């Protein structure tokens, strides 16, 4: 095995390659928020964009460069003087130049011979270095490039004083064993640091990145949530936690910020992560099966990796109710919410949960509490903290979406209003403002459960208070605004009732 680096640098390309994901286009405000979050996370390099691509791209890279972040700011450029000048004029710390090196890429994308490519690459490296700026050189499509030519061009730019070379698996065709051998050969041939950039076309981006580190790579290119061209890139959280938790290899990443970073990028890009996404997915530390949940409640490492905990990545462990749930986990969840039951009532609740699950229904926290209250005879309208009598929503192409709610809150009449980016957002903000406590919506999901323009909408929301208590609730109606309001109010009511039970 090659000498593995004790500390690996993290090069994040969410704002460049990540934004190249179809359907993703980030305004400057969002790019700045993501850049600041990446800096908080501790990435070593932020590739802020491709400055020569558009005027807006140039301005965004320049703006991010002016933020005085701890991370180095990098701009992408072809081996073209105009591209390089644009990056330098955007005040980046590093210019990342690239050129095709595989036979298929050379034949179809550049009008130069192999020798001319080397000559031009060296010229560009020297030009960048003469301006006092760092330089990264990428041999595009490296994994389909003849190894000897790859060694030749990398050695040439190394002699020109390039700061780091990048080995990109541009079309995701590398496999871990082959990529390990390639990086090992290059590591033995070069003195300059090696960086890798892996695409996920065959689902191997993370594995290939890991293999490269074990072969002696110094730096890894990643994106938050693995977003990027086609099937995406190596996922930041997965790569970092494999290195940290499994191999004991250090990075400068503050892992407790991984989950919040994932959620921010998910929200700003509009790219929803699947719940089973490793490390940062909603279900990454969730347990429904009775056997698993029972074990985790006794000792978390029975059915979790153990070397990584939700706290390490800023996540939370969840015990979820469903048809696979066991009596023990149902009892624990109810006890934590202030419900104390004898065995007979617990068995009744257990059977009703199983019955709902067998009918294909998702059993939310509030479903469980409602079942419990029916069984023990406590479900009363007057116990609800919020009773909404009237909802008025205004929206339009020239009207700021506004919601007005007339409600009874803890027995007192209250009228409140809020504005939002849309009618649902405005309505949910109005609901949360009804309660004089810190309550926020951490998850919102909507599905159409019938067809047609008058489809029945089903909304799931998760609300959380400042003490970390959270509940998931559902609402259903033909009006998506009302479905959303119902779901949030149900969750808030039970959150407040749970607090009263515990007080």
Swiss-Prot record:
Its EC number is 2.3.3.13. Signal peptide: none annotated. GO terms for molecular function: 2-isopropylmalate synthase activity; metal ion binding. Pathway: Amino-acid biosynthesis; L-leucine biosynthesis; L-leucine from 3-methyl-2-oxobutanoate: step 1/4. Residues 8-259 form the Pyruvate carboxyltransferase domain. Disulfide bonds: none annotated. GO terms for biological process: coenzyme B biosynthetic process; L-leucine biosynthetic process. InterPro entries: 2-IPM_HCS-like, 2-isopropylmalate_synth_dimer, AIPM/Hcit_synth_CS, Aldolase_TIM, LEU1_arch, LeuA/HCS_post-cat, LeuA_allosteric_dom_sf, PYR_CT. Belongs to the alpha-IPM synthase/homocitrate synthase family. This is Probable 2-isopropylmalate synthase. It comes from Archaeoglobus fulgidus (strain ATCC 49558 / DSM 4304 / JCM 9628 / NBRC 100126 / VC-16). The lineage of its organism: Archaea, Methanobacteriati, Methanobacteriota, Archaeoglobi, Archaeoglobales.
């Amino acid at each position: 095995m090659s000498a593995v680096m004790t500390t690996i640098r993290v090069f994040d390309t969410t704002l460049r390659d990540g934004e190249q994901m179809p359907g993703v286009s980030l305004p400057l405000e969002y790019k700045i928020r993501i850049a600041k979050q990446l800096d908080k996370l501790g990435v070593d390099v932020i590739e802020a964009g491709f400055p020569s691509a558009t005027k807006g791209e140039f301005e965004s890279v320049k703006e991010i460069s002016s933020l005085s972040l701890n991370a180095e700011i990098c701009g992408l450029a072809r081996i073209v003087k105009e591209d390089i000048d644009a990056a330098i004029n955007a005040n980046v710390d590093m210019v990342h130049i690239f050129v095709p090196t595989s036979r298929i890429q050379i034949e179809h994308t550049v009008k130069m011979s192999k020798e001319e490519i080397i000559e031009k690459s060296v010229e560009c490296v020297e030009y960048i270095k003469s301006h006092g700026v760092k330089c990264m050189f990428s041999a595009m499509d490296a994994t389909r490039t003849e190894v000897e030519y790859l060694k030749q061009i990398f050695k040439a730019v190394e002699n020109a004083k390039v700061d780091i070379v990048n080995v990109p698996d541009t079309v995701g065709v590398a496999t871990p064993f082959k990529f390990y051998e390639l990086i090992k050969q290059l590591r033995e041939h070069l003195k300059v640091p090696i960086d890798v950039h892996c695409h996920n076309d065959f689902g191997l981006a993370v594995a290939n990145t890991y293999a490269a580190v074990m072969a002696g790579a110094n730096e890894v290119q990643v994106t938050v949530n693995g977003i990027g061209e086609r099937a995406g890139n190596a996922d930041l959280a997965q790569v970092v936690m494999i290195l940290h938790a499994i191999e004991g290899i250090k990075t400068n990443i503050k892992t407790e910020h991984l989950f919040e970073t994932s959620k921010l990028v998910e929200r700003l890009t509009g790219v929803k992560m699947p719940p089973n996404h490793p490390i940062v997915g909603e279900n990454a530390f969730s347990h429904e099966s009775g056997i698993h949940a029972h074990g985790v409640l006794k000792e978390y490492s029975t059915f979790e990796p153990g070397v990584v905990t939700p706290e390490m990545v800023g996540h939370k462990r969840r015990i979820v109710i469903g048809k696979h749930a066991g009596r023990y986990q149902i009892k624990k969840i109810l006890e934590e919410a202030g419900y104390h039951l004898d065995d007979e009532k617990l068995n009744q609740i257990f059977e009703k949960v199983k019955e709902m699950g067998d009918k294909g229904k998702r059993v939310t926290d509030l479903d469980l509490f409602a079942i419990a209250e029916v069984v023990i005879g406590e479900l009363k309208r007057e116990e609800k903290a919020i009773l909404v009598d009237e909802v008025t929503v205004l929206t339009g192409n020239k009207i700021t979406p506004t919601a007005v709610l007339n409600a009874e809150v803890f027995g007192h009449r209250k009228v409140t209003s809020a504005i939002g980016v849309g009618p649902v957002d405005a309505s949910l903000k109005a609901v949360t403002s009804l309660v004089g406590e810190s309550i926020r919506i951490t998850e919102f999901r909507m599905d159409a459960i019938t067809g047609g323009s008058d489809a029945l909408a089903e909304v799931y929301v998760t609300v959380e208070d400042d003490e970390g208590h959270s509940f998931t609730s559902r609402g259903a109606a033909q009006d998506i605004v009302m479905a959303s309001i119902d779901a949030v109010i149900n969750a808030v009511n039970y959150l407040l009732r749970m607090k009263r039970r515990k007080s």
